[in-house]
């Protein structure tokens, strides 16, 4: 069979070919991200199918380190449509994140010393693997958010003015 008539579908892909499945856009607004880390996820089969279908919400998610393991809490993955109640997963199940021991220790030290938090930023495919980008961040105050909005608005106005001329 020839591939002459086939066209590739357009998807959310970044420069290096990874397909973005979900993104936590609110996290960059509410937190000042100091460091990022790519981790794997320990998932069930129905969770993988739901994530690939884009039925995941990272908005309220956060990570904790317990017993030298990173755990992902409060991330909603909708149940898979074609699986029965017995075989389906729990939507708010706590998921284990896969990272190297040294990376976990580094995160643990920074969380204890500086009072930071770990937030899920984006969920994407890397090859056939589902990866989660987490960020170590410090919460922003309301006035910091307002200042950030003013800076972004002024940059946008300057860019629009330059575009007209």
From Swiss-Prot:
PROSITE patterns: SSRP
Biological process according to GO: trans-translation
Keyword Repeat set for record: no
Assigned keywords, A-Z: Cytoplasm, RNA-binding
Locations listed in the record: Cytoplasm
GO cellular component annotations of the record: cytosol
Basic residues composition bias: residue spans: 1-10
Region (Disordered): 1-21
Main localisation: cytoplasm
Record carries keyword RNA-binding: yes
GO molecular function: RNA binding
Family matches, as Gene3D superfamilies: 2.40.280.10
Family: Belongs to the SmpB family.
Function: Required for rescue of stalled ribosomes mediated by trans-translation. Binds to transfer-messenger RNA (tmRNA), required for stable association of tmRNA with ribosomes. tmRNA and SmpB together mimic tRNA shape, replacing the anticodon stem-loop with SmpB. tmRNA is encoded by the ssrA gene; the 2 termini fold to resemble tRNA(Ala) and it encodes a 'tag peptide', a short internal open reading frame. During trans-translation Ala-aminoacylated tmRNA acts like a tRNA, entering the A-site of stalled ribosomes, displacing the stalled mRNA.
Protein name: SsrA-binding protein
Organism this protein belongs to: Prochlorococcus marinus (strain NATL1A)
Encoding gene, per UniProt annotation: smpB
């Amino acid at each position: 069979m020839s591939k002459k008539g086939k066209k590739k579908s357009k998807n959310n892909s970044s420069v290096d070919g990874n397909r973005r499945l979900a993104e936590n856009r609110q996290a960059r607004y509410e937190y000042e991200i100091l460091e990022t880390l790519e981790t794997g996820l320990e998932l069930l089969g129905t969770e993988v199918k739901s994530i690939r279908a884009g039925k995941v919400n990272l908005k309220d998610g956060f990570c904790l380190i317990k017993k030298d393991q990173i755990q992902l809490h409060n991330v909603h993955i909708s149940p898979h449509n074609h699986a029965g109640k017995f075989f389906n997963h729990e939507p708010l199940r706590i998921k284990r994140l896969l990272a190297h021991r040294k990376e976990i220790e580094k995160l643990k030290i920074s969380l204890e010393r500086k009072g930071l938090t770990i937030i899920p930023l984006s969920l994407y495919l890397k090859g056939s693997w589902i990866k989660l980008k987490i960020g170590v961040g410090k919460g922003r105050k309301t006035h910091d958010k307002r200042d950030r909005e003013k800076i972004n608005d002024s940059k946008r106005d300057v860019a629009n003015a330059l575009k007209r001329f």
